[in-house]
Amino acid sequence: MSNATQYLSLKDTLELFSKSDDSLRAKIKAHLNQTKHKFIVLDDDPTGVQTVHDIFVITDWGKDWIKKGLSDERSVLYILTNTRSHNADKTENINREIVQNIVDVTKEMGINYSIISRSDSTLRGHYPLEINVLQDELLKTADVEISGHLIIPAFFEAHRYTIDNIHYLGMEGQLVPVNETEFANDSVFGFKTANLPKWIEEKTNGSVASDSALIISLEDIHDGGIDRVYEILLSANNNTPIIVNAKSYYDLDIVSLAVLKAIDSGKQFLFRTAASIVKSIAGIQDRPYLSANEIVSNDESQNNGGFIIVGSHTNKTTEQIKELMSKYPIEQIEINVVKVLNKETRMEELTRVCQLVDQNISSNRDTLVYTSRDLICAKDKEENLKISQTVSSSLVKVIRSLKVKPKFIMAKGGITSSDVATDGLDIKYAKVLGQAIAGVPVWLTGSEAKFKDTPYIVFPGNVGDKDSIAQIFENIKKDQKGEI
């Protein structure tokens, strides 16, 4: 972030158009209870549950698991696809298979639903691919014509806002356009503009012009309310992109009520969003952050060490683990990524790490495992994805090698936390307990997992302040022992 650049004040900007209405969320919930409409969230990494609680996430999209996930009265189900870590072909295949299974199961169960494609609040991920595939497959398998897809990257818990069609990150008290942050330089999903209409044109390689998008502005929301937003939604057809400006839950609650009204009128929508809209449109109320006792296993593993595993290579993550290591006595094990990427040295390096981790955990020593911080890049996106996958699979091997159950498990990074969940811990069905801190969800593993009934802290790579990992660690240690 350049010191010479003049940015909008975060505080001053958020105070403009500031409104609240605590009754809106209850109205959303009442509507869903009456209509029984469900939202099925296809989550491209496991961090998308970072605003919700008391809901379930499945990591297996077979028909039996989808049926189990839709069998209760909850209005939302998450399906972890992990497509952000896959190439375009695999991403397309996964989305098609899931839609086919959803269509079959919901037809059998008599459920009306909408699909949310939940992705990154910093605009990374397979857009427009996933939306286009969902539209095409719904038309083929269910004869559903999508009127439009709402683009809603707002994620308030991590200070991500969309104002005048520009998507911002709140950083150091200022609003910074997302294209001026490290996330825009992502080796796989990089982009050049934070102006969402122009971003659509950029990501579609010009096939969708910037002026073809419908806009729901803050003025529409605050001055026109539900009726004005509803009017805009009714004008959508043939999968029109619809950009939603939002800087508070009031804005999203108004949009959610208008969307539900439009659905009742026969409109069909897809959604490309970050995490905040799910909390709103599913009518989920606030709850306090989880206590340390809710984050730590309530069994004999309390006598074992906790385990933190870090794969994310963002600057934010590097700052966070440095802060943790400087503040608290925790065993530190660095995985040498160069050795992991070399077939001749990979096994020796992983054997070393696995032995140390198991010794530490069984001896009640909290342990941090992290990848070496030098980012290794290839010449193209496909090779960069392969590097990420190789590193992540190595972290999975560390988890799978554990012989004793840690008292808590935290994974840092989207790809890391997904692979740890599905391949390391063998999670198929988990309950989302809530959040440890803003934007950091906690799962409770199911009976099928490697370690059942274990709190699993899913920490996104792009979330939190410098001391956020240390803050969670401190909260756990204080509640467990009364001291650090």
Residues covered by each model-derived region:
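Short acidic, glycine/serine/threonine-rich loops at helix termini
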Residues: 51-54, 126-130, 160-168, 253-258, ...
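Gly/Ser/Thr-rich loops at beta-strand to alpha-helix junctions
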Residues: 41, 45-49, 119-129, 156-158, ...
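N-terminal short beta-loop-beta anion/metal-coordinating cradle
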Residues: 50-80, 352-365, 431-450
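Cap/lid and interdomain-hinge subdomains that line or gate substrate/regulatory clefts
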Residues: 29-43, 53, 86-92, 96-115, ...
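Conserved, well-structured core segments that form the ligand-binding/active-site neighborhood
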Residues: 166-353
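Conserved, well-ordered active-site substructure
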Residues: 55-59, 405-407, 415-464, 468
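N-terminal basic/disordered segments at the start of proteins
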Residues: 5-72, 157
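C-terminal structural cap/anchor segments
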Residues: 350-414
